[in-house]
From Swiss-Prot:
Keywords: Oxidoreductase. The lineage of its organism: Bacteria, Thermotogati, Deinococcota, Deinococci, Deinococcales. Residues 1-11 have a biased composition (Basic and acidic residues). The keyword Oxidoreductase applies. GO terms for biological process: protein modification process. This is Peptide methionine sulfoxide reductase MsrA. Has an important function as a repair enzyme for proteins that have been inactivated by oxidation. Catalyzes the reversible oxidation-reduction of methionine sulfoxide in proteins to methionine.
Length: 206
């Protein structure tokens, strides 16, 4: 899978790591695995993950905070410590965790601390919540290599955090882009990411 960043800084240097394939993070013989990604507004992350071949389900939600049963208002108010995130259920025989990581890093700015564009706050932090030791190892290796190769031109601030309870967000947040393609934020922020995803990663889409 060629490396075509979709973040705010344009094209980074070519990265040899994206030519590698790796099944780390998969469970032998498993047809289903889950992974959790936080890359800014969960509407964006959900939209770029939903149509990938091998992805069975994407749920928007909250993770990494200290308050049980958070809701959107409290998370957006910075009162709970949670990040907006998505939980992806996928078939590792069709798409690997490493592939999903590549798309994650390509579709947001992992060098921006607690901010994605105009969305500011710890709830918009770039973070990974590995669910297995294999996922954690793969995530650390990718972050290290992207940093070594200076792919983004600035230090990566993506954190790797313990996978605490994932709280599924309110119903109206699910399938948000598909249900609201004409909404202003969707048109201005999400649609360009989805268009570039189709352009550069068309072979990974259904």
């Amino acid at each position: 899978m060629g490396w075509h960043p979709l973040g705010e800084h344009g094209a980074p240097h070519n990265s040899s790591m994206t030519q590698q394939t790796n099944s780390q993070g998969t469970q032998p013989g498993a047809a289903q695995e889950q992974a959790i990604f936080a890359g800014g507004c969960f509407w964006c992350t959900e939209a770029v993950m939903q149509d990938l071949r091998g992805v069975q389900k994407v749920e928007s939600g909250y993770i990494g905070g200290t308050v049980p049963n958070p809701d959107y208002r409290s998370v957006c108010g910075g009162q709970t410590g949670h990040a907006e995130a998505v939980r992806v259920t996928f078939d590792p025989n069709q798409i690997s965790y490493r592939d999903l990581l590549g798309l994650f890093f390509a579709t947001h700015d992992p060098t921006s601390l607690n901010r994605q564009g105009a969305d500011v706050g710890t709830q918009y932090r770039s973070a990974l919540f590995p669910l297995t030791q294999e996922q954690e190892q793969t995530a650390r290796e990718m972050i290290e290599q992207l940093g070594t190769e200076d792919v983004f031109g600035r230090p990566i601030v993506t954190s790797i955090e313990p996978a605490s309870t994932f709280y599924v967000a309110e119903d109206y947040h699910q399938n948000y882009y598909k249900n609201n393609p004409g909404q202003g934020y969707c048109m201005a922020v999400i649609s360009p990411k989805v268009a570039k995803l189709r352009q550069y990663y068309g072979d990974k889409l259904r």
